[in-house]
Each structure stands twice: as C-alpha cells, then as structure tokens.
Amino acid sequence: GELEDALAVCAWARQRWNCEALWLAGFSFGAAIALEAAATVGPAALVTVAPPVGRLIVTPVLRPDCPWLVVQGDRDELVDFATVRRWVSGFDAPPQMLVLPGAEHFFHGRLGELRAGVLEFLAQGPVGGL
C-alpha cells in the first residue's frame, strides 16, 4: 500500500543521494502516511498539512522525534479544526502548528501562505534534508 511505497521511496532516496537527513511531508491522506512512515524512517523534519485527524488518524500516535509542523485551515470542511487543535495540544511536546485563518481543506487562494509557512519552518531545521 501507500505506506510501503513511502518507505521504499525513503530507502531509495537515502541510497541514491547517500543522505541520512530526510524531510517527510504530506497533505491530507498523505499527511497520515508521512506521519506513519516517520516512525520507521526517523526523518530530520516532518510537515503534515491538513492531517485527517478523526478520519484516518484515529488511534493515539507516537510523536515523531524530529521538528514537526502541522498546517491547518480553520475553515476546513473535511477535517474538523477543533479536533486537530486538541490532537496537537495532546502531545507532551506538541508540534508547531500553523493556522491559516479562513483557509479551507485545499487552501484555495492560500497556497502562497502555505508555502511561505513551510519554507520558514524548514529554514529553521537541519541542513542537508532531501
């Protein structure tokens, strides 16, 4: 399935570029896959955009041991904003959360802000990510 595909890509990238520091990112369903893959891959950083908390992410999750950004719109019509906020704050060391006020699930008209927030987060992280 998708998790196995993600793990295979990570293994391939590490071998291809001889690089241990991988950054994982995913949007919606991809955020759930990236979060699950992080437990095996041990990324240098993780970005989850509109993670499907309460839909696909329903069980307790171990917090990845890396810098982690959660991006969420507060008008998401598919993923409940309050549920995501509670989930994020439930971790002993909560991930960084970027809220885009007024943004819906697909961030229509807000992709520039989304991009800027992710780039700012990654600029604070380890050098050498792939």
Model-assigned labels for residue ranges:
Residues 1-17:
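Alpha/beta-hydrolase active-site loop
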Residues 25-34:
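Gly/Ala-rich beta-loop-alpha elbow adjacent to hydrolase catalytic centers
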Residues 64, 69-72, 76:
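Short beta-strand/loop motif that positions the catalytic acidic residue
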Residues 74-79, 105-106:
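Acidic catalytic loop of the alpha/beta-hydrolase fold
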Residues 103-115:
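Catalytic histidine-centered segment of alpha/beta-hydrolase-like enzymes
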